[in-house]
Amino acid sequence: MGRVLLSASSLLLHIQVFTRRLGNEYIEQDRPPCGTSGHPGSIRPTEMKTMTFGLNDEERAKHPRESEVLNENGAARFQQRYTHMGQKMYTCVALTVVALVSTMHFGVEAWGGLFNRFSPEMLSNLGYGSHGDHISKSGLYQRPLSTSYGYSYDSLEEVIPCYERKCTLNEHCCPGSICMNVDGDVGHCVFELGQKQGELCRNDNDCETGLMCAEVAGSETRSCQVPITSNKLYNEECNVSGECDISRGLCCQLQRRHRQTPRKVCSYFKDPLVCIGPVATDQIKSIVQYTSGEKRITGQGNRIFKRSLKAPFA
């Protein structure tokens, strides 16, 4: 407000000087003497003392005193007329400037904007208005705040990830991480070894035995989870024995049949040497259940076991 009043006062001062110069230039214009143009307003100030108003040469010679009085009165009226004209012009201009300044002060001062009413179109990038998520060229009211408004987003600290964050104590790390100091006074945050199911991790080595580090659905984080295995069942194609369900006694074998292309399928085995790849026989948990289409192989050991049972009673 102080700046507006100061600029208005300086403007009024310049207008006053301009009107005075304009009046002087108008008076000093070359006009014909009185009697030729018809009014005394065309007389220049330099001719005022040498001219008389209303007297001819003979009367001026007879009455020198009266001629001087008339000259002085005419000059006074002449000067008063143009002075009054300049004052009127100055008053009109001053009133106009005051009216303009008074209308300029009706604005509302606020932080962050140059408007005095809420308009949804000005905040279309925040979800308001009819544009929705439409991205258009940013206008005057959608530009980011700078230091000229008194606020700035540059002063906000950058978010440092939990992994490999510099630390001196475990409290400086995220939950589930510890501060490991190898050399020097400053260490780095690392995940604990042997993380349980659901805890954050970075590699499979960070998890306990039997768990693997996998991405969480719907986020960018990784946590220790139970490995999802889809062991193949009987007569399903495979590449190595690790793909078959070993708990049911299946391994991957090369199957050859008459007039058919050889293929690798999961099948029951008796000797691990017929399987493709290593087989952990100690993981077989269930009794082998043969199907009706399989060839039943009768173990000789069972007959021997039966004979051994009958021997004492013979």
UniProtKB/Swiss-Prot annotation:
It is found in: Membrane. The chain crosses the membrane at residues 90-112. Its main location: membrane. Keywords: Cleavage on pair of basic residues, Membrane, Signal, Transmembrane, Transmembrane helix. It is a single-pass type I membrane protein. Residues 1-19 form the signal peptide. One of its GO terms (cellular component) is membrane. This is Prohormone-3.
